[in-house]
A protein has these predicted regions:
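Membrane-interface "cap" regions at the ends of multi-pass membrane proteins
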Residues: 1-56, 204-210, 229-236, 420-430
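Hydrophobic, membrane-embedded alpha-helices of multi-pass small-molecule transporters
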Residues: 23, 27-39, 183-190, 198-259, ...
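Membrane-water interface regions at transmembrane-helix termini and the short interhelical loops
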Residues: 47-49, 75, 99, 121, ...
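Juxtamembrane transmembrane-helix boundary signature
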Residues: 59-92, 102-116, 418-427
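Transmembrane alpha-helical segments of multi-pass small-molecule transport proteins
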Residues: 101, 129-158, 173-183, 205-224, ...
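Hydrophobic alpha-helical segments and their helix-loop junctions in multi-pass secondary transporters
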Residues: 116, 120-121, 155, 173-199, ...
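Membrane-interface loop-to-helix entry segments
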Residues: 142-185, 238-245, 342-354, 404-412
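C-terminal membrane-solvent junction of multi-pass transporters and transport-like membrane proteins
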Residues: 353-430
Length: 430
């Protein structure tokens, strides 16, 4: 029995009449995805070791470099009309793209589960503060099922419905209100001059802080083309993505640092959530909590699109199955090793997209027309070289930082190997 192609089928280029996202749509989407409880908690990771000034510098530089790379990869989706994992076939070959698709599926299931866990913990905390610890509203199982179901339904509906009917019309304004409220509360109640003058305890090198900050935008590299493929123009894709994500991510991660230092210096797991719950009767935290479901939606939807490369099933059906899996994991797994999880993502996907960016913009000059191949060994070897470089630097020279050197080296290897082998042979055959 043949399966009717979905609008979101990964291998089908989006036709011109379906490319409806303008710059404002993409700004709204990426501003929203740059905001979330996990972004706040990532800022909390930096606070003790780097202090306020060091953390803000690491966040600024990491986010700036990260969003430029993210927006550039978004242009690939706009140029080709393909999903993120389908576009990798142009660089790695039809079979070579299966490995990153599988890795992406696994990491997105992890991200989706983490998002549900974070939402559950925050909602349970708000329920405990508003009612009592034993009340139904503080029940973590209830909230896990609620947020898992909500994120799954959003993922099944798809980004076209979500962005244009929900996020752009009212969602972004609620987010702005929450961020402004948290910012006002910080300036009103914290001694920022004292926090600024206080140095970190040195437990985290600046380069590691940069790597953690850049990991947030880079974590979206394997997803962005799933949404930018619906963009009308490449320049709007680049601008809307870069500006939207930079503002949201820098703002919220900085608030995570400041709130941790000002109101939650104990370093306990729920200390930051308690501090946020105390601001504005918990309403800003509630609004950001609702936004977190958008991040989980993106993880589940893109996991379904990635698995569509491996399984010839309808994306909507895959989204339903993956949403159930994420919810089950959230019920059973603790929130631990988050920092290592972020760095591991950077070790695999940052070098990969160094290869992809060089291949698309320099070697193929933004063309989607390439000779078919099952495996493109030069690109695969360049990727392997980048991943090896990342782990070598991270283990032997942690003060140097690993993400950017690995990405740049992988790109340079692709430039050299691609010209010497794949593209050289294709030119010779022509």
């Amino acid at each position: 029995m043949s399966i009717q192609p979905s609008t979101y089928s990964p291998d089908l280029a989006v036709p011109a009449d379906k490319r409806v996202f303008g710059g404002r749509d993409l700004f709204s989407l990426w501003f929203s995805l740059g905001i979330g409880l996990m972004v706040l908690q990532t800022g909390a990771l930096l606070a003790p070791g780097l202090g306020l000034s060091g953390s803000l510098l690491a966040i600024f530089l990491g986010t700036l470099v990260g969003v430029l790379l993210l927006a550039a990869v978004g242009v690939i989706g706009s140029d080709t009309g393909l999903s993120s994992m389908a576009a990798l076939k142009l660089s790695l070959g039809s079979k070579g793209a299966s490995l990153p698709a599988l890795l992406n599926l696994l990491q997105l299931i992890g991200w989706g589960s983490f998002e549900i866990i974070v939402m559950r913990d925050a909602a349970s905390l708000l329920g405990t503060r508003a009612f009592s610890e034993g009340s139904l509203w503080s029940n973590p199982v209830l909230w896990t099922l609620f947020f898992g179901t909500l994120a799954t339904l959003l993922a099944v509906s798809g980004p076209l419905t979500f962005v244009r009917q929900i996020l752009r019309k009212w969602g972004i304004w609620l987010l702005l209100a929450a961020c402004l409220w948290l910012t006002w509360n910080l300036f009103a109640k914290a001694d920022l001059a004292d926090l600024w003058s206080r140095a970190g305890d040195g437990s985290m090198p600046f380069a590691v802080g940069f790597d953690i900050a850049i990991a947030m935008p880079l974590s979206w590299l394997p997803l962005i083309a799933d949404y930018s493929r619906f963009g009308k123009r490449a320049k709007n894709v680049f601008g809307g993505t870069a500006v939207g994500f930079f503002i949201g991510n820098f703002w919220l991660m900085s608030l995570g640092v400041a709130y941790t230092l000002a109101f939650a210096p104990s370093g306990e797991v729920n200390a930051l959530l308690l501090a946020l719950a105390g601001a504005g009767l918990g309403i800003p935290l509630l609004l950001i909590l609702l936004d977190e479901s958008e991040n989980a939606f993106a993880d589940i939807h893109s996991a379904a699109v990635s698995s569509g490369i491996l399984l010839r099933l309808k994306v909507e059906h895959l989204a339903l199955a993956i949403g159930v899996i994420c919810t089950l994991i959230a019920l059973l797994a603790p929130l631990a090793q988050y920092q290592n999880f972020l760095l591991l993502i950077g070790s695999v996907f940052a070098p990969l997209f160094g290869v992809v960016l060089v291949d698309h913009f320099i070697l193929r000059k933004r063309s989607a027309q390439v000779a078919s191949a099952a495996l493109r060994w030069p690109a695969l070897l360049a990727w392997l070289g980048g991943v090896s470089t990342y782990h070598l630097l991270a283990n032997l020279y942690p003060d140097v930082g690993a993400t950017l050197p690995a990405l740049v080296l992988a790109g340079l290897l692709q430039l050299v190997l691609g010209r010497a082998f794949s593209y050289g042979r294709e030119t010779a055959q022509a």
